[in-house]
């Protein structure tokens, strides 16, 4: 296997096949969650999706994130050649549909189409005195990246009071970091943490903690105790998988420390989603062949699913556009809702555009899906959907109620929920918010029977274009209805109350 092929295989496997340690955590989470709840249903769907992605070698989640490589080479190894080979492997994987084109010009909004551009991919080069090349890769999507957070101590925190410049102040920050993420970062999640450093090095070091194995033990006793405390107690907040409420909210916490300036005390948190895509390879420096894999164990759990994901009972609400006002007002928060027929995707660019322009398709009575799919072209010019899970909906909060009212949309599908403005819009105009399972890109792409068309592809790129998808059996949970009910509001309130139980010092003053 050449260097080019080895790098390509690393990218493909990272995107499509979870590492052994993360598989164990998801398997354990399924046993700990209360059966027959929304969170247990979400975990079952996650497990099934992981199996589907591995079997078909397609992306676990449609948001394949910002590829971040951690590279160690022998002294004297040509890193410039390796950098170019990594770039070519990233472009190759993007063309093959293993990565979604995610590199966007921040000024023009133009998607590069191949995941290459200033700052992408991210590559950290280091030298070591071993005669081998070590390359680790993490794919961290935008939903969880947006839930990263940085604290500057001392700082007042909701529910917890003042976080001081000590280990107990750090503890409060980490508990708050889990609370503020709710389900928007695709919980159950993981924390990579840095205590200290400056604003830049702190975030970088926090992300580097995600390369630690899930079952390792921090060599610093105080930090090992802190990591254990946070995992145990964050799971008492009741946020649950996808923010549906439940026992399993956090799967891991890894804390590092850097020296700081006297005037600064930063606590930087990198929030990682359940779809923790992180693998590594050790290469022969002469041939580029893979000598061994990292984060892969011979006895890993090969099959995670123990059920069928959404277990349909016949009591589900079935919706197909165009949906009437009477039909949509019969849907209540907590209902399992199955979508058949046409759905139109729309993310950030589409929402902003629709505020000022007409839609290219009739949206009256329609279903709008917050989704940026992975798409590849068939030989006949038609499109094939390779991954189609939901994106985080909170980014559309400034627009959503206006878009619903302007076009008569009846159902919005996304993940993580939306806020008070959207909830009022659902009541006023007669619409619902449906929470799909975040990261379950193969579970949902399997529901796509046909791609009927695409609009604004040239202007916005693949993730941000408006895709017209024909679906069958697309299962969701109604979490916000047209009667003012919101599961997300309720879980936020209850978890904030629980957070207050952890205000008292634990690690001293």
Please provide the spans of the model-predicted regions.
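Glycine-rich beta-strand-to-loop/alpha-helix junction loops that act as flexible
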Residues: 191-198, 340-341, 415, 438
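Short, well-ordered loop/turn sites that connect or cap secondary structure elements
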Residues: 330-331, 337
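Non-transmembrane, aqueous-exposed alpha-helical and coiled segments at domain scale
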Residues: 1-193, 198-310, 403-405
């Amino acid at each position: 296997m050449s260097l080019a092929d080895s790098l390509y295989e690393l990218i493909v496997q990272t995107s499509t096949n979870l590492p052994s340690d993360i598989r164990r955590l998801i398997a354990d989470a399924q046993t700990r969650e209360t059966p027959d709840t929304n969170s247990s249903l979400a975990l079952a769907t996650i497990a099934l999706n992981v199996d589907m992605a591995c079997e078909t070698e397609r992306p676990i989640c449609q948001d394949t994130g910002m590829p971040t490589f951690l590279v160690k080479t022998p002294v004297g190894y040509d890193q410039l050649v390796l950098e170019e080979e990594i770039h070519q492997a990233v472009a190759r994987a993007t063309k093959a549909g293993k990565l979604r084109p995610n590199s966007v010009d921040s000024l023009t909004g133009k998607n590069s189409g191949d995941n290459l551009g200033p700052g992408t991919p991210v590559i950290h080069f280091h030298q070591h005195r071993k005669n081998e090349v070590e390359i680790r890769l993490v794919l961290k999507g935008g939903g969880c990246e947006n839930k990263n957070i940085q604290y500057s101590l001392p700082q007042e925190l909701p529910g917890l009071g003042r976080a001081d410049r000590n280990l107990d102040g750090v503890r409060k920050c980490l508990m708050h970091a889990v609370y503020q993420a709710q389900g928007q970062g695709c919980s159950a999640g993981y924390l990579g943490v840095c205590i200290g450093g400056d604003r830049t090095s702190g975030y970088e070091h926090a992300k580097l903690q995600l390369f630690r194995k899930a079952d390792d033990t921090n060599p610093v006793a105080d930090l090992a105790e802190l990591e254990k405390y946070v995992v145990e107690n964050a799971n008492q907040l009741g946020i649950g998988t996808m923010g549906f409420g439940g026992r399993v909210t956090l799967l891991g916490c890894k804390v590092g420390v850097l020296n700081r300036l006297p005037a600064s005390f930063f606590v930087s948190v990198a929030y990682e989603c359940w779809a923790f895509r992180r693998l590594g390879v050790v290469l022969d420096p002469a041939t580029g062949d893979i000598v061994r894999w990292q984060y892969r164990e011979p006895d890993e759990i090969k099959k995670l699913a123990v059920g069928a994901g959404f277990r349909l009972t016949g009591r589900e609400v079935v919706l197909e556009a165009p949906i009437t006002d009477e039909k949509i007002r019969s849907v209540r928060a907590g209902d399992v809702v199955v979508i058949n027929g046409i759905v139109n995707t729309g993310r950030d660019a589409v929402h902003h555009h629709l505020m000022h322009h007409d839609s290219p398709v009739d949206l009256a009575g329609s279903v709008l899906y917050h989704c940026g799919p992975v798409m590849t072209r068939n030989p006949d010019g038609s499109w094939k959907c390779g991954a189609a899970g939901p994106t985080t909906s909170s980014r559309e909060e400034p627009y959503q109620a206006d878009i619903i009212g302007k076009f008569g949309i009846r159902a919005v599908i996304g993940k993580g929920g939306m806020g008070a403005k959207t909830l009022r819009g659902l009541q006023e105009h007669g619409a619902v918010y449906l929470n799909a399972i975040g990261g379950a890109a193969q579970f949902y792409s399997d529901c796509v029977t046909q791609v009927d068309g695409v609009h604004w592809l040239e202007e916005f790129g693949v993730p941000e274009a408006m895709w017209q998808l024909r679906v069958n059996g697309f299962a969701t949970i109604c979490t916000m209805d047209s009667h003012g009910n919101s599961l997300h509001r309720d879980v936020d309130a209850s978890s904030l109350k629980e957070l207050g139980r952890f205000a008292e010092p634990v690690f001293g003053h």
